[in-house]
Amino acid sequence: MNLSNTQLFRGLEEAEITSLLGCLNATTRSFQKGEVILSEGNITENIGILLSGLAVISCNDIWGNTSILGHVAPGSVFAEVYACIPGESMLVTVSAAEDTSILFMNVGRVLATCTNACPFHTRLVRNLLTVCAHRNLQLSQRIQHTSSKSIRGRLMSYFSECAKRAGSNSFLIPYNRQQLADYLNVDRSTMCNELSKMKRDGIIEYDKNRISLKV
């Protein structure tokens, strides 16, 4: 992956990124599908960038019910909020949805100016603030999608956002049916029934993860 295309390293040249990775003591790790990357209750000092694959962010209540909070696509940053708060236990679990490669960087080295006084280190910190702002936006969007009392309302809210982002009424969603139900905080079987009704009503068409809105 070209790191200059990621949010965290946006605006930096390849040579600058290479220099920064040395200063940040960055390491790369691989995870197999289903493997836990970071666990709820753990404390982390590392920011992660997903280089390849896909990861899912979830949380479990005391009864064992799972809620999907979001996904991590290639180039995306995760765990930055917890890493920036010393001693803060994670409230979520990050798992590999498929075979995944991740770049980890120590947040202390990211926030502190290195001994080499890299002139581009300030840009990195600004980018990190932007990443944190985007994370808050994503959480706000999930609140919006789950605010409707009806399952159809939640589905349409989410599909509408996906269509706007894709710039098309036909798009792929990153979740399977169970993950989508968890993300929208609804029962999977009931949600699947509602999807079938929406298809019969001529509102949507779908084939696995591809959704087409009939507008």
Where are these regions (language model features)?
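A short beta-strand-loop-beta hairpin characteristic of the jelly-roll/cupin
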Residues: 55-67
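Inter-domain helical "communication" segments and dimerization helices
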Residues: 114, 118-125, 130, 134-144
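Phosphate-/nucleic-acid-contacting segments
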Residues: 151-154, 158-215
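Glycine- and acidic-residue-biased ligand/ion/polar-headgroup-sensing regions
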Residues: 34, 45-58, 73-75
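Short, small/polar residue-rich loop motifs at catalytic or cofactor-binding pockets
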Residues: 23-24, 42-44
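Short phosphate-coordinating micro-motif centered on Lys-Gly-acidic
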Residues: 36-42
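Cyclic nucleotide-binding regulatory module and flanking cytosolic helices
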Residues: 1-33, 82-86
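Cyclic-nucleotide recognition modules
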Residues: 24, 68-126
